[in-house]
Amino acid sequence: MAEDRKKVVCIEDEPEMIDLVKLILGRKGFQVVGANGGREGLALIERERPNLVLLDLMMPDMDGWEVYQQMKAREDMKTIPVIIVTAKAQSIDRVLGLHIAKVDDYITKPFGPQELLESVERVLAKVSA
């Protein structure tokens, strides 16, 4: 495995969605690690130290906003960029995410492979700039 591969943690309660993200981003050289739900996701972020987190909002054990708040409250996680990937497609949800919570990007399901890839590359480019 190349050392310069960007590591992405995908926190999602649907294994099929994790597999889809792994397929899309894996083809472009990203290393994707999946977490089934928020609690597992936080533990995985702590262990893996990813370059980026893809975060679902609606999960049964701990919702995405709670995961995001815990990340931003921790010194070792607060600088990791977060892209929300959710079925919550109403404009108010997007405004809350991008302008109130200040997530790095907000993608609604269903999404196209190119949309996901462009978002990930844009956010990572902004962080490394």
Where are these regions (language model features)?
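Conserved acidic carboxylate
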Residues: E12
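Charged docking surfaces used in two-component/phosphorelay signaling
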Residues: D19-R27
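Alpha4 helix (beta4-alpha4-beta5 surface) of REC/receiver domains from two-component response regulators
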Residues: K22, E66, A89-Y106, E118
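Helix N-cap/capping motif at the beta->alpha junctions
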Residues: G34-A43, G64
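Active-site beta3 strand of CheY-like receiver
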Residues: E48-L54
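Receiver (REC) domain active-site loop signature in two-component systems and cognate sites
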Residues: M59
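C-terminal output helix
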Residues: P110-E121, S128
